Amino acid sequence: MAYHTPFAAQPPVASSGLPLTLISLDDWALVTLTGADRVKYLQGQVTADIDALSADQHVLCAHCDAKGKMWSNLRLFYRGEGLAFIERRSLLDNQLSELKKYAVFSKVVIEPQPDAVLIGVAGSQAKTALAEIFTELPSTEHPVTQMGNSTLLHFSLPAERFLLVTDTEQAQQLVEKLAGRAQFNDSKQWLALDIEAGFPIIDAANSAQFIPQATNIQALNGISFTKGCYTGQEMVARAKYRGANKRALYWLAGNASRVPAAGEDLEWQLGENWRRTGTVLSAIQLNDGTVWVQAVLNNDLAADSVLRVRDDALGTLAIQPLPYSLAEDK
């Protein structure tokens, strides 16, 4: 089987019923940072403590404007001697222009890697399948491994899965090895798994709209409140220590006559009436017809609240439990 992306689209499946699946991640992009100042420069730009990031760890963090609003969130890790991050392709160009603003004063080279191949490996027996190709696999304790031109990231949520950053040659080998027993799918399958995991999806429509805590990044250990200064730090800290954040990320599931787009609002049932509320970050329809919506809503919303896609008289969406706690130490 010849390697080419994106893989043919299939309706996404929830993690509990997902067979071994290779997923082309064309809706995501890879960026690398190299040079002597790569750590120092990024430390002043993102919410995570880059000084504390080890070579066998990855972190989801935020890149904010001066008001603490996220240009993007980034899945950050070491790749070779340099740093790398993965973000949604829809906002790549704008986010990079913001990240590079002061790079001319530092010894750092920040550049997209359009030739890199990103493949998700998920579903039943994902680890066993990868073990046939890679001698060392990442784990919960050591979620990043490097082998030659390949970097493997391990995710525990919503179920064990892997993200492979590699070149075309290695991708071809993986596809050939697993072609007889794996399904293939496009980016929407990985998107569904991220929604189920409660990992915030920031696309261009929602860039510079939310502080990190409105999308639960603090609950995913993506914000350091003890590191030095970074762009937007004052507003991010205020949200924690002064209780300024009134929003949170939610996972909703139910039925809808259409899949809402990023940036749309939803409707919340109040007695006999419906009131507009929140912002959709991402949404997907599964193979069984269920619609999943990831949205930013008021963080005091009752767990039994009924919502729906805007103007969808026949649909209802219910809040689903996230696989992590939002309880915070003050």
From Swiss-Prot:
Matching Gene3D superfamilies: 2.40.30.160, 3.30.70.1630, Aminomethyltransferase beta-barrel domains
Binding-site list for folate: W28, W190
UniProt subcellular location: Cytoplasm
The keyword tRNA processing belongs to this UniProt entry's keyword annotation: yes
Main location: cytoplasm
Swiss-Prot/TrEMBL keywords: Cytoplasm, Folate-binding, tRNA processing
InterPro entries: GcvT/YgfZ_C (IPR029043), tRNA-modifying_YgfZ (IPR023758), YgfZ/GcvT (IPR045179), YgfZ/GcvT_CS (IPR017703), YgfZ_barrel (IPR048451)
BP GO annotations: iron-sulfur cluster assembly; RNA modification; tRNA processing
Spans through the membrane: none
GO CC terms: cytoplasm
GO molecular function: folic acid binding
Role according to the record: Folate-binding protein involved in regulating the level of ATP-DnaA and in the modification of some tRNAs. It is probably a key factor in regulatory networks that act via tRNA modification, such as initiation of chromosomal replication.
Family recorded in the similarity comment: Belongs to the tRNA-modifying YgfZ family.
Protein name: tRNA-modifying protein YgfZ
Native source organism of the sequence: Yersinia pseudotuberculosis serotype IB (strain PB1/+)
